[in-house]
Amino acid sequence: MSAQSSSTANIFVVLRQLRSLCYSNRPVTTSLSYTASHRTQSTTSTNAIKTQWHSSASYSTAPPSKPEKRPVEDIDLSQPMKSKPKKPQPAWAVQKNALKAKFKEGWKPRKKVSPDTMESIRKLHSMDSVKYSTKNLAEEFKISPEAIRRILKSKWRATEAEEIDRRDRWEKRKIRIQEQMMELGLRHSDPVSEARPGLQEELSRGTSVWNATEKTAGGYLPQKSNREFFPKKRFGAEERSAQDGDPWDVSGRDDLIDTKRDSFGDNWPQNSHMRRGAQSRTQTEDYHRQGYRGKPNW
């Protein structure tokens, strides 16, 4: 009976030591285990218990280590390497690769050559076939040598009616492009004014004065040269006779009786200011309508 009680006490001691190793907190001992541990001596040594605990599997929180890569020298090139499966290409990528394989030089559309250019190529080649060879003409006109050969070999020529029709179409095309540019504000209208047909001559006369001034030393105009650009007022016979006499003498002239006389308004009819203002407005509108190209270089 005593041997059985001693073995039981030894088991309790071992369990208590294992528990103390597993948990950091001090375990609560009971009166039975306390009495048994103090009354009986342990038969299992403490070093044996520690050795048994350390030999058990331990848990590590560190990430798993990556496998070491094999050096390049150890790789056997004779064995086929496993390649990753490629993703299926979309339809547009397949078509793009096919076009690249077919047209290695890229997108080079044919250059359209006008009939005048073809005629120039024929004339140059007929003048000097060595200087204007097929290769030189191809480099000059930026087209392929095969196109130059076809142009030189072709015997087709346009008739006179076809040539006239083609030139008319080109003229209409030029006018249409100019009208479109004028609508977009990229080109100004013709400087010739329909209201005053003689205005172009006056502007050209003013421009010639400026050109003559630029050639002189210093490039300065005379004092009253800027008045030459504007048309002078033409006086009638009555107005000319009124200017010859005394401006303050109103006897015998009925047109100045009811008018306000001053140093500027004398010798003018009653409605002369209105007519002169209308004329200046018309002239200003013409200058604005012509654009900057039709104006004299003031």
From Swiss-Prot:
| GO CC entries | mitochondrion; nucleus
Tell me which UniProt keywords the record has, alphabetically: Mitochondrion, Transit peptide
What residue spans carry the region label Disordered? 35-92, 186-298
TM helices/strands, residue ranges: none
Q: Where is the transit peptide?
A: 1-41
**From start to end residue, where is composition biased (Polar residues)?**
35-63, 205-214
Q: Where in the cell is it found?
A: Mitochondrion
Compositionally biased tracts (Basic and acidic residues): 225-243, 251-264
Q: Which domain of life is it from?
A: Eukaryota
What is the documented function of this protein? Required for respiratory activity and maintenance and expression of the mitochondrial genome.
Q: Which family does it belong to?
A: Belongs to the RRG9 family.
Recorded protein name is: Required for respiratory growth protein 9, mitochondrial
**Species name:** Arthroderma otae (strain ATCC MYA-4605 / CBS 113480)
Q: Lineage of this protein's species?
A: Eukaryota, Fungi, Dikarya, Ascomycota, Pezizomycotina
Q: Which gene encodes it?
A: RRG9
